[in-house]
Amino acid sequence: MNNNNLMETFYLETPSLERKNEIIDYINEFVEHKSDINGTGSLDKILDGYTFEQALESCLNMQYEEYAKKFGRCQGKTFLLIRKNDNKIIGTINVRWNLTEKMKQFGGNIGYGIRPTERRKGYNKMNLYLGLIEAKKIGLDKVMLDCDVENLGSSKTMEALGGKLERTEIDPYDGILTSVYWINVDESLEKYKDDYVNFIDKNYEMIKRKWK
């Protein structure tokens, strides 16, 4: 996504023990930069005293309805955004379904983030496009996302992928003025395919054709 001679390519990967140290470093980077952590699912539980193995288990199990309900959560899958060129974790994205009533109002189907040292390079748009591919696999026709109204970078990311602003209101759970967007999954995957398909790793599970 940068203007250099070597084209960068990306893919989403399920968190694993093999990436333990890298994931811990990724989360710690947010702490060091005093930045909010988004899109990590349960992985950031390591900041609350959980072992990495416990956090990973929770993260991977959240896709199962029975497990999610036990904790009053919605089902979700978390992915690492990997830049293939240097095998580095650039960001994370969490795709959710069977939303709780709370998440239907604020939070929505997708949460994402890019590590502080890799921001302002357009990576979150790639992250969201790949997230929409995963949303389609799950069977979501449209997805809801939100962000603080002051987070102009996130708003621009959502709008760049076809996000339509539905409402702006105060989230009663944190008291922050929040913008809520909706994205039509099939429509956006097709409309913006030419902008992103060449940056997706060729081995990633992606069909380069019209979305149907």
What are these regions (language model features)?
Residues N2-N109, T178-K212:
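GNAT-family acyltransferases
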Residues D146-C147, G162-S179:
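Conserved catalytic-core motifs of GNAT/GCN5-like acyltransferases
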